[in-house]
Amino acid sequence: MARYCGPKNRIARRFGANIFGRGRNPLLRKPNPPGQHGMQRKKKSDYGLQLEEKQKLKACYGMILEKQLVKAYKEVVNKQGNVAQMFLEKFECRLDNIVYRLGFAKTIFAAQQLVSHGHVLVNGKKVDRRSFFVRPGMQISLKEKSKRLAIVTESLENKDQSSLPAYLSLDKAAFKGELVVAPELDQIASQLPLPVNVSVICEFLSHRT
């Protein structure tokens, strides 16, 4: 499935949340879902609900691809432990998302650009693959020149240290952060801009693999 390239505000309106963390909340101007002029939303079938939860998760992590969902599920489904937690961890610990959570970028899309353009270092080495899986103990920092980028400095200045997830540490002065421990399911859920039923998504994917 191709990457979504349409208006991001349309996605936010569809789910009724400022899902991408933008300064201007698109719901203030148009609170209704696209194509609707009232607040009534149609009741969905079980299959429709599964699709919606899947689309919500994709949006929460910067419009990730269908094949990335399937790949993540295949990697965890036969492992011991909480499948839903391990599945969600695959996306929460993506490099672009960690960069976003640390406050190096105001939005997940800006974080994706920082990674793709080679501004981000992992344990001192450049990594430009946004889907790179960050493991506990890995340090995330920026190149010296990149520390002076306006999008970085402005974002860090506005970063509330108290909003930093417990599984991350941040040294603002050094432009450096670390994934301290693997995040728990409830910790990840608290960081998402809207509730996502991960179990429903895993059930849907179980019929696709």
From Swiss-Prot:
GO terms for molecular function: rRNA binding; structural constituent of ribosome. Gene3D superfamilies: Ribosomal Protein S4 Delta 41, Chain A, domain 1, RNA-binding S4 domain. Keywords: Ribonucleoprotein, Ribosomal protein, RNA-binding, rRNA-binding. It comes from the Bacteria. One of its GO terms (cellular component) is small ribosomal subunit. Residues 22-45 are annotated as: Disordered. Coiled coil: none annotated. CDD domains: S4. GO terms for biological process: ribosomal small subunit biogenesis; translation. One of the primary rRNA binding proteins, it binds directly to 16S rRNA where it nucleates assembly of the body of the 30S subunit. Belongs to the universal ribosomal protein uS4 family. This is Small ribosomal subunit protein uS4. The gene is rpsD.
